[in-house]
Amino acid sequence: MHQPHDLQILPTPVIRLIEELSRLPGVGPKTASRLTFFLLRAPDELPRALANALIGLKQQVQLCSRCYFITQNDLCAICANPARDQRIVCVVEEPLDVVAIERTGVYRGLYHVLHGRIAPLEGMNREDIYFDELLDRVRAEPIDEVIIATNPNLEGEATAFHLQRALAPLGARVTRLARGLPTGGDLEWADPGTLGSALEGRREM
């Protein structure tokens, strides 16, 4: 990787960390440099704990075998909770969307995480996400309702359309979050009140 002139005066371990941090979403070279020098000044325990947490993240976290949310076990905490309504499944694009919906406190069903959306221009088709796994699940489990909670943008709406068409013959009620979420936004950034209202006001597709 070509290094800016101002980085060439720095020790190699410092340059390497700046470059690696710069690869994270939302972290530019300036922020990466500030974080690196903060860690350089920090007590040894902090960078060591951070390194261990990063290693643990990749070694100990996996996808739930049922809904594809993140977990340390075969089933995630939501799927393993008998108090959740097993007959309702909310379909979201990413794990952070589950966190956003849970924050509302109004939803007590299960989830299905697609890990993406249908976006042909980005090379993302139904085979690249957990689309068909949802269909298999609806066939195998006594699910009465599928709530489609993909993002209110072009790709999210396209994904919702394809999901509705595929789910229609399977017998479950298919609903979509009510209008009111900011168009073009991501579910994870919606405030809990607005998202909760969209869930409670969901409409038939």
UniProtKB/Swiss-Prot annotation:
Spans traversing the lipid bilayer: none
GO BP annotation list: DNA recombination; DNA repair
Annotated S-S bridges: none
Superkingdom in the source lineage: Bacteria
Matches recorded under SUPFAM superfamilies: Recombination protein RecR
Keywords: DNA damage, DNA recombination, DNA repair, Metal-binding, Zinc, Zinc-finger
One Pfam family of this chain: RecR_C
Single GO term (MF): DNA binding
Keyword set includes DNA damage: yes
Coiled coil feature spans: none
ZnF locations on chain (C4-type): 64-79
Alphabetized CDD domains for the sequence: TOPRIM_recR
The keyword Cell wall biogenesis/degradation is assigned to this record: no
InterPro entries: DNA_Rcmb_RecR, Rcmb_RecR, Rcmb_RecR_Znf, TOPRIM_dom, TOPRIM_RecR
Domain Toprim: 87-182
HAMAP family for the chain: RecR
Function in brief: May play a role in DNA repair. It seems to be involved in an RecBC-independent recombinational process of DNA repair. It may act with RecF and RecO.
Name of the protein this chain belongs to: Recombination protein RecR
Source species of the chain: Roseiflexus castenholzii (strain DSM 13941 / HLO8)
Gene giving rise to this polypeptide: recR
